Amino acid sequence: MNNNQLSAQLARQLGAHRHLLVAFSGGLDSSVLLHLLVGLRQQLPDLQLRAVHVHHGLSAFADQWVTHCRQQCVAWQLPLVVQHVQVDSQQGGIEAAARAARYSAFASTLAADETLLTAQHLDDQCETFLLALKRGSGPAGLSAMAAQTSLGNNHLLRPLLGHSRQQLEAYAQQHQLSWIEDDSNQDPRFDRNFLRLQVLPLLNQRWPHFAAATARSASLCAEQEQLLDELLAEQLHNLLDEDRALAIDGLLTCSAARRFALLRRWIALFGVTMPSREQLQRLWEEVALSREDAEPQLQLGQYQFRRFRRRLYLLPLMADLREISLSWSLDDSLMLPDGLGELVSGEGDICLRAPQSQQKVSIRFSAQGKHRILGRAHSRPIKKLWQELGIPPWQRERIPLIYYDDQLIAALGIFVSEAGQTPEGQQPWRLHWRKK
C-alpha cells in the first residue's frame, strides 16, 4: 500500500473526527501514526493535532524518551503534553498497572471535543487475541481490540490495526523516521514480550498469515458480541431502573447462558473489568440468591456488588465512616469526609430546632437504639427505620446525622427526629447540604 492509499485510508477512518490527541510513546508505531497525521493535516486544514506522552518512571531512559518526543513534536509543529504517572505493580501486575495508569493519563488529558488515537497494529491484535485465549476468555475477550470504541465521554480510534509491524517499519525507513526502542520490550518475563519474541516468530514462520487470520477470528467474535448486544438490548433495558440497578426476578426464568450474557452486558455499562465466569457464578449464587434478610456483597477490584429489594447494584468501594464524629461550631461551613460535600449553616431548605447554647453539635454516620421521627407515632429501631424508608445499607453510613450532644436530631435529607422539631413560635435553624 503506497503513501497516498495510506493517507486516504486514514482519512476515511477519521470520519468526522477533527480534534485529535495522539498517544505518542516515541516508538515505531506511534511515530508512524503521528507522521501520517502530520502529512494528512496538509490535506485537511481543519484537522487539529496534539500529542500526549506518558512518563511511567519505570525505565532509566524515560527522561531521554521525553526529550526525543519533544524534539520530534517541535519539528512537526504540534503541541505535546507530558503526563507523569505512578505505576502500582500490586494492581494486577506491572503490564496491567502501566496500561491502567496510561489510559487514566489519556482520559485526563483529553479535551471534551477530542478523540484519542493509539497506534496498535496487526501484530498487537494477534498478541491480544492469544492472551485472551490463554485466559480462557469468551467471544468478548477474543474480540481483542476494537478499531473504534469509547473512552469515557470521548472516542478512541486505532487506525493501524490492519497493518503489520513489518509494514510500519518499511514506512518508517522510507521516510527516514527516528524512533526509540523501549528496553523492556526485550524482557520475555512479560507476557506480550514472550509472545512477540518467542511464540509469534515460530507461528509466522509456519503460517505466514497467522496474524491476519487471528485478526479475522477476533473480528468474527466481535460480530457475534454485537449481535448478542442487539438481541439482548431490549430485555436488559426492561430489567434496569433509573439507577441502573438490575432486577433479579427478571433473570430467574432465563437459561444460565442468557442470564450470564445479561449480567455481562449490565456490568459493561459501568466500564469496569469484566469478572470471570467463576465470579459471575458467585455473584448470582452468593449475592442475587442469598437469604432475603442478608446484606450480601462481592468485591470486584475497586468495585462491589450489592443487593437491595430484589435488585443488584454495582458500586465503587466506599470508606467506612461509622467511627467518624465531626464537631461543628456552626460559624463556618463543615467539609464532610470521602467527597460527600459540605454543610453550610444559616441557609438552605433543611429546618431543625436550633441547638441550645450549651449543646454541642456534631456530625456522625452511625446511630444506635430506637428513635421516633416526625410523622411516626412510635419509636423504631434505627435499622427498621432505614428499611421502612427504603435506604440501601451502603447509603445508610453515608448520610450525615446531626447530633446535639448525644441526641439524634436528623438524618439529612431523610428524616427529622421528634427532638429536632422546631417548637412553635421559634425560628428554625436552616442548613444546606452542598453535595459534590
UniProtKB/Swiss-Prot annotation:
Ligates lysine onto the cytidine present at position 34 of the AUA codon-specific tRNA(Ile) that contains the anticodon CAU, in an ATP-dependent manner. Cytidine is converted to lysidine, thus changing the amino acid specificity of the tRNA from methionine to isoleucine. One of its GO terms (biological process) is tRNA modification. PANTHER family: TRNA(ILE)-LYSIDINE SYNTHASE-RELATED (PTHR43033:SF1). ATP binds at S25, G26, G27, L28, D29, S30. Belongs to the tRNA(Ile)-lysidine synthase family. Its EC number is 6.3.4.19. It comes from the Bacteria. The keyword Signal does not apply. The lineage of its organism: Bacteria, Pseudomonadati, Pseudomonadota, Gammaproteobacteria, Enterobacterales. InterPro entries: Lysidine-tRNA-synth_C, Rossmann-like_a/b/a_fold, TilS/TtcA_N, tRNA_Ile_lys_synt, tRNA_Ile_lys_synt_N, tRNA_Ile_lys_synt_subst-bd. Keywords: ATP-binding, Cytoplasm, Ligase, Nucleotide-binding, tRNA processing. It comes from Serratia proteamaculans (strain 568). It catalyses: cytidine(34) in tRNA(Ile2) + L-lysine + ATP = lysidine(34) in tRNA(Ile2) + AMP + diphosphate + H(+). The keyword Endoplasmic reticulum does not apply. The N-terminal region contains the highly conserved SGGXDS motif, predicted to be a P-loop motif involved in ATP binding. One of its GO terms (molecular function) is ATP binding. GO terms for cellular component: cytoplasm. Pfam families: ATP_bind_3, TilS, TilS_C. This is tRNA(Ile)-lysidine synthase. It is found in: Cytoplasm.
